[in-house]
Amino acid sequence: SLVGDVLQQIQDMMQEHFDKERVEADGDTAVDLETGDYSEDEAVSKMIIHALYEQRDSALLLLTRSQGSSLEGAVDELIRVVTIHYRMLADAMTEKLGMEPLEESFVHWISHMQIDTFIYMITHIEKEEEALRYIQQATHYMVNGWYGMFRSLGNDRT
């Protein structure tokens, strides 16, 4: 289906990005805490935006009119997948920093925030060019908030 195709395309892009981050999670996260490099996150976000806006009508159907269809739980499924990924990233960060794991409800909330960023964008911003400017700011906020949280929690231990 057209709506299912856009969902699959987004899921594939997310999975490819998550696979890269999984490999990076085995690296030196202390460096990431200092640099806050989010170029890969921004690049993937731009690809997702392009896919969403290229098929905006289908994306809007998925997000606003899928009740009662086989895709009714699509957003919840995206959040579930993101939560699993963020749990892995959070556990890698807290382990390397010698910290207690983050609460599951907190990791789940972060996942909602990530997906809600795109839902807000596609339902409220009509032009792809404006969405690209929006996502640059949103990505900066989310990535720096993520790393800032670990810097802050790490400093609280000392």
Where do the protein language model's features map onto the residues?
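C-terminal/domain-terminus segments
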Residues: L62-I79, R133-W146
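Hydrophobic/aromatic-rich alpha-helical bundle segments in the mid-to-C-terminal region
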Residues: L89-M142, F150-T158
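An amphipathic alpha-helix adjacent to DNA-recognition modules
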Residues: S1-D19
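Amphipathic alpha-helical packing segments from all-alpha helical-bundle domains
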Residues: S39, A43-D57, S69-T94, S105-H112
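Amphipathic alpha-helical segments used for helix-helix packing
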Residues: F18-D32, I49-S69
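Solvent-exposed amphipathic alpha-helical surface segments
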Residues: M13, H17, E21, H85, ...
